[in-house]
UniProtKB/Swiss-Prot annotation:
Keywords: ATP-binding, DNA replication, Nucleotide-binding, Nucleus. The lineage of its organism: Eukaryota, Amoebozoa, Evosea, Eumycetozoa, Dictyostelia. The elongation of primed DNA templates by DNA polymerase delta and epsilon requires the action of the accessory proteins PCNA and activator 1. This is Probable replication factor C subunit 5. ATP binds at G64, P65, P66, G67, T68, G69, K70, T71. CDD domains: AAA (cd00009), HLD_clamp_RFC (cd18140).
């Protein structure tokens, strides 16, 4: 659905309010306000809408990768439920900041137990716990008791990236909905609407680069576009500008590295990749992440390919725990040399 910016800009009472809105980050400026503005997960919104219409809304658990619309969806649902009473009937907490048991005992319990006297047809309040996977296990256990005690007057929506970090006792008390990464076509349509409103020109290669780097994360896509547009002089965004601003290696750079890894000797491949890394300021972690997409396209025996991917995962893990990039670059070149030798023996 197209974003109607005319409705948003006409509601401002003063120029200050208008300027404040215009200066917002794009992720907040274009955050969906109602269910019709959401671009994906129609099955989830339809199910929850039906539950609301039947007055059978349970406690909710939204989980999935970041930037897929979890928080926006529950906020849109809350606006549908409460309208002008939103601020009085909804408590929003970011559990990554307030993650201890004191929050459960004080803020959550106080809000859940308080009476409400507003003119609303909805017989319950709503507590939204964002990034709840950051809560301690003790706090989650205490929250379980609060949910049990105040179910008649309060509904809870637990939002997290990793459902495995939510204790089973909490999971069993909620209806779970998984938010998958956003599909490319509707994401591209929404991004084109936004860049048109912002008077930014993005060529097709640059748009493909944003979608590739975003990996179904709308927040990441918008942050990339806004960052690059701010660094652009004429508001023209190119593929090269996207990769230069984000620090990710360009596909042409990765193709060059793959050629060195497969055809050059150890010393030459190591030196060439090391020089390219320094020249373009690339991270080996980003190189590994992008490299695996190219590796699966190489014509190698399946057993050898599996070993190569296993080596790449070991390198990625070693980097995550602080191992030397130079040492792991040597390991990267070495594992390709071994794969080449194995392929020769296999043939």
């Amino acid at each position: 659905m197209e974003i109607d910016m005319a409705d948003k800009t006409n509601k401002f009472k003063t120029d200050i309010e208008r300027k404040q809105f215009e200066s917002l980050p794009w992720v907040e400026k274009y955050r969906p306000k109602n269910l019709d503005d959401l671009i994906a997960h129609e099955d989830i919104t339809q199910t929850i809408t039906k539950l609301i219409d039947n007055n059978t809304l349970p406690h909710l658990l939204f989980y999935g990768p970041p930037g897929t619309g979890k928080t926006s969806t529950i906020q849109a649902i809350a606006r549908k439920l409460y309208g002008d009473n939103y601020s009085r009937m909804v408590l929003e907490l970011n559990a990554s900041d307030d993650r201890g048991i004191d929050v459960v005992r004080e803020q959550i319990k106080t809000f859940a137990s308080s009476m409400f006297f507003f003119n609303t047809t909805v017989p319950y309040k709503l507590i939204i716990l964002d990034e709840a996977d950051s809560m301690t296990n003790i706090a989650q256990t205490a929250l379980r008791r609060v949910i049990e005690k105040y179910t008649k007057t309060t509904r809870f929506c637990i939002v997290c990236n990793y459902v495995i970090k939510i204790i089973p006792a909490l999971q069993s008390r909620c209806t779970r909905f998984r938010f998958s990464p956003l599909p490319t076509p509707p994401t591209e349509i929404r991004l084109k609407e936004i860049i048109e409103k912002e008077n930014v020109k993005v060529d097709s290669k640059a748009m493909n680069a944003v979608l590739e780097l975003g990996c179904g994360d709308m927040r990441k896509c918008l942050n990339i576009l806004q960052s690059v547009s701010m660094s652009s002089i004429d508001n023209n965004i190119t593929e090269e500008a996207i990769y230069k601003c984000t620090g990710y290696p360009m596909p042409s750079d990765i193709e060059l590295m793959v050629d060195w890894l497969l055809n050059s000797d150890y010393e030459e491949a190591f030196q060439n990749i090391s020089d390219l890394k320094k020249k373009k300021g690339l991270s080996l972690n980003d190189i590994i992440a992008t490299l695996q997409k190219f590796v699966v396209q190489i014509d190698l025996d399946n057993v050898i390919l599996c070993k190569l991917l296993s080596h790449l995962s070991d390198i990625e893990y070693n980097l995550s725990i602080g191992s030397s990039e130079k040492l792991q670059l040597g390991s990267l070149v070495g594992c390709f040399q071994l794969s080449r030798d194995d392929e020769l023996l296999h043939n």
